[in-house]
Structure formats: C-alpha cells, structure tokens
C-alpha cells in the first residue's frame, strides 16, 4: 500500500509527517510506483530527480512470481531483490527520471547499493548527515545538467 503524503502542487505540509515504517521493503515496487506517479502526474517541472533513502537490502515475504527463467519463482531478497531494484532504477532512468540514493545501511549492503544506484549515491552513518548528503547529490545533478 502506497500513500501520497503531498502532491507537487500541494502547499500544505501537514501530512508529510504521517509517514511510518512497517514491515518489508519491496524497493523495486516502490520505484515502479514513483515512476508511475511521475508519468501520470508529473507536476510543473520538466525534469525530475528522485532521491531515495535506502538500506540497499530489499526484501519481502511475497515471492517473485514464476517466469520462464525461474519456473518456481524465487524469494524477494538478496540477489533477486537487488536485481529487481536495479532494474527499476534503470527503467526510471530510461524514462528520463534521474535517480540518486542516500545509503544508510550495513557495510555488508554497500556492494548492493553500488549495484543498484551506481555512482549516484552518498553514504551516511546517521540521520544528522542526511541533508548534507542529499545536498551533494543535488549539486552533482545540477553540474551534470551543465555538461
């Protein structure tokens, strides 16, 4: 279940603090939903930058459905979850959406973060570093616009 806390044109910030975490994080699905939102309600901006706060450890209790490559399906965790999330990042990029990530996860997930987000990532160790890291990512995107 996804809930839009604030639309692009919404000036009211009251709902923004109604976010809460609960359970699993199927990152690929969340990225796909973000792409759908930007495609069907793009707002006034001609370009979009999506900054994701992540632990780079996508997992879910629901399995990935069977496919020709995996007739029995597989668990949404580890390599399968990372591959799905990375595929969704690439799909957003093909749509023209810039995707960057602030990674706040375990050392063991750093490789997954790099696989998913590539160079468009900043690592933080605490929430007090979030604003600075997001600012650096935004500056990098602005620099690339000038190239």
Task: Report each predicted region and the residues it spans.
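Acidic, glycine-rich A-domain
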Residues: 1-147
């Amino acid at each position: 279940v996804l809930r839009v806390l604030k639309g692009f044109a919404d000036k009211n910030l009251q709902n923004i603090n109604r976010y809460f975490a609960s359970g699993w994080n199927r990152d690929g699905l969340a990225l796909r939903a973000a792409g759908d939102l930007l495609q069907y309600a793009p707002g006034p901006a001609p370009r979009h930058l999506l900054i994701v706060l992540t632990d780079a450890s996508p997992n879910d209790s629901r399995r990935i459905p069977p496919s020709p490559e995996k007739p029995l399906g597989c668990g949404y965790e580890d390599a399968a979850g990372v591959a799905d999330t990375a595929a969704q990042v690439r799909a957003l990029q093909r749509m023209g959406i810039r995707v960057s990530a602030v990674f706040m996860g375990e050392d063991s997930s750093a490789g997954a973060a790099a696989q998913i987000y590539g160079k468009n990532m900043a690592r933080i160790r605490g929430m007090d570093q979030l604003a600075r890291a997001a600012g650096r990512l935004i500056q990098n995107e602005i620099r690339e616009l000038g190239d």
